[in-house]
């Protein structure tokens, strides 16, 4: 699909109290105006560069810049990443762990209009292996799955229930 469709990755643990997504939102209206001025200036300066762009790579750059501007200027984007706006019962229902809060974040992003979300459930919750591929250390599968499966079941069932309760089932595959 090209670079313009590369994912925006969130690598921090959404269950951490200090969770935040870097470079989301601007502090005030003055910063938003300055960003708009910079974008306009850059567009006026890159006309010569476009004349020599035979590969069309600047089109992908334009898409990146539009996405970045949206991330910086749209308060709905910043709010979607703010899990403190969820009540404690909802956060508990998903599970107060990395996986549960990732899936809660996925639901919030769908509500904010994000069309494609991938949640990568790896990390320390997987036991001795950092992913779901246990065949290399299969003597520990039961131990790992005994922990993983209830955690996964809790988070994923909460996501499915929320998707239907909020009427998102027509937009989520």
Q: What feature does the model see in each segment?
A:
Residues 1-173:
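Ligand-binding pockets and gating/stacking loops
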């Amino acid at each position: 699909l090209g670079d313009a469709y590369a994912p925006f990755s969130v690598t921090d643990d959404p269950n951490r109290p200090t969770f935040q997504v870097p470079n989301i939102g601007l502090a005030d209206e003055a910063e938003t105006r300055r960003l708009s001025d910079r974008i306009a200036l850059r567009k006026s300066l890159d006309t010569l560069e476009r004349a020599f762009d035979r590969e069309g790579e600047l089109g992908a750059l334009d898409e990146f810049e539009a996405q970045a501007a949206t991330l910086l200027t749209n308060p709905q984007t910043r709010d979607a990443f703010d899990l403190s706006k969820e009540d404690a019962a909802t956060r508990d229902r998903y599970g107060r762990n990395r996986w549960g809060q990732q899936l809660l974040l996925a639901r919030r992003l769908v509500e904010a209009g994000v069309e494609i979300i991938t949640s990568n459930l790896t990390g320390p919750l997987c036991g001795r292996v950092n992913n779901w591929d246990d065949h290399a250390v299969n003597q520990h599968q039961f131990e790992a799955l005994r922990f993983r499966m209830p955690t996964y079941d809790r988070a994923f069932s909460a996501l499915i229930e929320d998707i239907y309760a909020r009427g998102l089932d027509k937009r989520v595959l």
